[in-house]
Amino acid sequence: MKSKLKLHGFNNLTKTLSFNIYDICYAETPEDLQAYVQYIDEEYDAERLTQILTDVVDIIGANILNIARQDYDPQGASVTILISEQPVTPTDSQIEESPGPLPDTILAHLDKSHITVHTYPEIHPVDGIATFRVDIDVSTCGVISPLKALNYLIHQFDSDIVTVDYRVRGFTRDIEGRKHFIDHEINSIQNYLSDDTREAYQMTDVNVYQENLFHTKMLLKDFELENYLFGDATRNLSAEQREQVTERLRHEMLEIFYARNMPH
């Protein structure tokens, strides 16, 4: 075990985890598309999001100071939680490069600054495709990385595509006055994901180590069409229609994953 870094004063490093989660579906009729948006809007309303973020606060061991939440018309929701700092002696499991807990195994000890979430349901005007995007930011100041919340959050949403960014900014000084621009080892965000998550997703990294900037994109490997169909009308799709819908959905997912429009 490595000896702990002795600091002069408080740890001033800011660690920010930002990620976007996308859920994709297909509906045959305009009415079913609107029903999907309504379903998502109710399933992930401000109250549900508040509970999810409260669980994140538990995972990172923070104290809630204030919660601001809002449901929007016609759809969407947002929640911001301010969290307080207090002196903490982190355990080895909190600072090592390893996966955080799953939804059914939440345990925690950390303390930090703010968490926000916003939701964005949207539908394609002609192709029957609907997407639901969740943007989450977890920003902490101090010794423990917000990456410990990543594993839990991916399991809380139906995540077809996930884009994750992690950065460390600022510096802290040791007792000899030497600056430290990062206080933990990290080679890849993937090391904070559980084995089942790594096996389920195709992943690619773009990391700028000298800038303490890490980026991982994730695309679900297994594609079961039944998991992407919404509404009663989709039950009557012919084999040819099912093949066409599969192509549309995969094309949509690849465009989101690569962040560019692609030819059909």
UniProtKB/Swiss-Prot annotation:
It is an enzyme of class 4 (lyase). Keywords: Autocatalytic cleavage, Decarboxylase, Lyase, Polyamine biosynthesis, Pyruvate, S-adenosyl-L-methionine, Schiff base, Spermidine biosynthesis, Zymogen. Its EC number is 4.1.1.50. The record marks K112, S113 as: Cleavage (non-hydrolytic). Is synthesized initially as an inactive proenzyme. Formation of the active enzyme involves a self-maturation process in which the active site pyruvoyl group is generated from an internal serine residue via an autocatalytic post-translational modification. Two non-identical subunits are generated from the proenzyme in this reaction, and the pyruvate is formed at the N-terminus of the alpha chain, which is derived from the carboxyl end of the proenzyme. GO terms for molecular function: adenosylmethionine decarboxylase activity. It catalyses: S-adenosyl-L-methionine + H(+) = S-adenosyl 3-(methylsulfanyl)propylamine + CO2. The modification Pyruvic acid (Ser) is found at S113. Pfam families: AdoMet_dc. Its cofactor is pyruvate. Pathway: Amine and polyamine biosynthesis; S-adenosylmethioninamine biosynthesis; S-adenosylmethioninamine from S-adenosyl-L-methionine: step 1/1. Binds 1 pyruvoyl group covalently per subunit. One of its GO terms (biological process) is spermidine biosynthetic process. InterPro entries: AdoMetDC_fam_prok, S-AdoMet_deCO2ase_bac, S-AdoMet_deCO2ase_core. The active site is at S113, H118, C141. It comes from the Bacteria. GO terms for cellular component: cytosol. Catalyzes the decarboxylation of S-adenosylmethionine to S-adenosylmethioninamine (dcAdoMet), the propylamine donor required for the synthesis of the polyamines spermine and spermidine from the diamine putrescine. Belongs to the prokaryotic AdoMetDC family. Type 2 subfamily. Heterooctamer of four alpha and four beta chains arranged as a tetramer of alpha/beta heterodimers. This is S-adenosylmethionine decarboxylase proenzyme. It comes from Pseudomonas paraeruginosa (strain DSM 24068 / PA7).
